Amino acid sequence: MSQARPERADAVRNRRAILAATEELLATHRPRDISIEQVAQAAGVGKGTVFHRFGSRTGLMTALMIERAQALTEAVTSGPPPLGPGAPDRERLLAFLDAVIEVVGRNKSLLAELAFSGAAEPAATGQGAAAGDRTAKDGHKHDHPVYRFWHGHISTLIAAQRPDVDAEMIAHVLLGALHSEPILACLAADGPARPAAAVRALARAILDAPG
């Protein structure tokens, strides 16, 4: 079986520089106000390099969101409980929902931009594969690899506790609520505590409802 070629050092440097420049611009600009030209200038690379690497501005924002969510992915797959393996499914679900709300709270504007633009799925799975930074043209929020991972994990944990319910749809409902304007406004004004408590209450009610 052939192994994937390692990235060239200059390609790795360019990718890091582009993502770092985007992070810096996001500190003072809304995502939709950031252009590829601005990113290229801040990163010290040509505009064509950004397009070649990420395909579009949406592709760039998607790749950055994957980077920001990677720590949560690693915590779920190989970290300590309750996020990681080893804890009961119920505890893992509640811990994961708390963690998702924290990530959403720290990335409100970026997530809103990706939802607004209908961010498409990169060829990468969100596990750090650099070759998949480019995006397809047409997609939906649920095609985003971060969303797919979150949804799959939530639905799996719910199904393990309640095989009699539609775990996939419930996971969509829980995640969809976190992208709604009232919840994003609450996160911006007051932080994650109130939405987190509400989502935990909903999850407990679902798990404890009579069969």
Each language-model region and where it sits:
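Basic, helix-initiating cap at the start of DNA-binding domains
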Residues: 1-42, 59-62
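Amphipathic alpha-helical interaction segments
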Residues: 17, 59, 91-95, 99, ...
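Short hydrophobic/aromatic patch on the recognition helix
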Residues: 44-54
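Hydrophobic alpha-helical connector segments
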Residues: 63, 77-106, 127, 131, ...
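Short, basic, alpha-helical segments at the C-terminal edge of helix-turn-helix-like DNA-binding modules
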Residues: 66-73
